């Protein structure tokens, strides 16, 4: 890299590397399956740890840029928003040695993460380098250069494949779908078309999902965000940890003005199998809906947030999958159970999943359906054996039909 000095004198250079892969994420899902220095002159210090913004913008342009950027951008101070735009523009236009408005390395790292959280389409960035320019022991400026996983020709080729996937996916979305239907459709589509694979290349970005059809949680979450944004639904990336302390990624979405969490990875049966959840053979629900549009309280049972920026408290259950689909029990109700089983048989479903509002209702359901074996009243199983799974943390249980 070219060394630049403000004045003649001795210079020193130190190199290192910061990659974006700070989230090598797996996660753990609990589910049970059962049968019944200083220099005399200028010093430039370089470490490895995006188009230049116009000198001025009109108020309308500022608003437009803010609308085009995401959730994290909107929750930064004005100073950090300026830094955010400098970093974002440098990354998307492949600019080098861009002078930043901040000389705080921790702030630069934080805002860099905000940019990546808001922009899953910047899939080709794997880190950045910064250069410190000092006069004596006084830091004068920092410049920024992105580090890229692919060259621009490769990026264009991959983007074509990504566009093909997105067009195929969205072409099958129901016409006039409301936001809940869009979220549910994309959740299901990604699960049906993706296998959990910690060994696949590019598993921290959307290429693994859209090109390889295999990924880990950050790939799932960024793909979910990308598709929902393309479909006109707000979605952003959320980082945190799950049971066991492993890094994890999922999404925050907005439906009818209310925020919900979505974890597409934990909804995928292939993750449940790889995660060692105890399912034998093929006895795994194809899709686990426990993590489709859930409130903060429910998510906190298994997930812990790393607040890159402040996140809202999700309190609504209106767009929760089980509520919208009629599988949610606020009290033990035999008629509701009978209706659900009957309708799912009529639809040819492979299994039924029931979810309860509380541990108390869950225990009532468990006592009736399992302990007293009343589930056989609703099942067509002449052999007298039923396979089921339960998730005590989420107060849900599934029965195979």
Which role fits each region the language model picked out?
Residues 219-294:
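Hydrophobic/aromatic-rich core segments of domains that either
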Residues 207-213, 238-241:
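Short helix/strand-bridging catalytic loops that position acidic/His residues to coordinate divalent metals
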Residues 212-216, 220:
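Secondary-structure capping and boundary motifs in well-ordered enzyme cores
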Residues 1-9:
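N-terminal secretory signal peptides that target proteins for export/translocation
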Residues 151-209:
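Secondary-structure boundary elements
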Residues 4, 13-177, 294-401:
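N-terminal accessory/pre-domain segments preceding catalytic cores
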Residues 140, 144, 208, 212, ...:
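Short, well-ordered strand-loop elements centered on a beta-strand within folded domains, enriched
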């Amino acid at each position: 890299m070219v060394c630049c000095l403000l004045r003649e004198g001795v210079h020193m250079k130190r190199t290192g590397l910061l990659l974006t892969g700070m989230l090598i994420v797996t996660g753990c899902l609990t589910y049970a399956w059962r049968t019944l220095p200083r220099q005399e002159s200028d010093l430039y210090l370089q470490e490895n740890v995006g188009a230049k913004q116009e000198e001025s913008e009109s108020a309308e342009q500022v608003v437009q840029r803010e609308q085009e950027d995401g959730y994290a951008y909107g929750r930064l101070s004005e100073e950090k928003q300026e830094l955010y735009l400098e970093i974002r523009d440098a990354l998307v236009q492949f600019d080098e040695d861009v002078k930043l408005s901040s000389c705080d390395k921790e702030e630069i790292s934080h805002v860099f993460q905000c940019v990546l959280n808001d922009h899953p389409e910047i899939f080709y960035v794997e880190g950045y380098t910064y250069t410190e320019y000092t006069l004596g022991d006084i830091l004068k400026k920092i410049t920024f250069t992105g580090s890229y996983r692919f060259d621009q020709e490769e990026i264009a080729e991959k983007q074509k494949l990504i566009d093909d996937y997105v067009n195929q996916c969205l072409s099958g979305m129901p016409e006039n779908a409301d936001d809940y239907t869009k979220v549910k459709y994309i959740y299901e589509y990604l699960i049906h078309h993706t296998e959990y694979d910690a060994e696949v290349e590019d598993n921290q970005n959307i290429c693994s999902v859209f090109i390889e059809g295999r990924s880990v949680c950050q790939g799932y979450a960024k793909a979910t965000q990308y598709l929902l944004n393309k479909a006109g639904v707000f979605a952003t990336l959320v980082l945190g940890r799950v049971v066991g302390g492993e890094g994890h990624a999922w999404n925050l979405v907005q439906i009818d003005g209310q925020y919900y969490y979505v974890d597409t990875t934990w909804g995928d049966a292939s993750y449940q199998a790889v995660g060692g959840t105890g399912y034998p053979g093929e006895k795994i629900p194809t899709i686990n809906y426990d993590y489709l549009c859930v409130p903060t309280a429910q998510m906190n049972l298994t997930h812990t947030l790393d607040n890159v920026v402040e996140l809202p408290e999700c309190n609504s259950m209106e767009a929760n999958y089980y509520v919208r689909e009629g599988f949610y029990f606020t009290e033990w109700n035999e008629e509701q159970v009978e209706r659900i089983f009957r309708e799912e048989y009529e639809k040819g479903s492979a299994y039924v999943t029931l979810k309860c509002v509380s541990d108390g209702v869950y225990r009532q359901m468990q006592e009736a359906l399992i302990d007293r074996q009343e589930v056989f009243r609703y099942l067509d199983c002449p052999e007298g054996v039923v396979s089921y799974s339960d998730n005590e943390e989420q107060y849900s249980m599934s029965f195979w039909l």
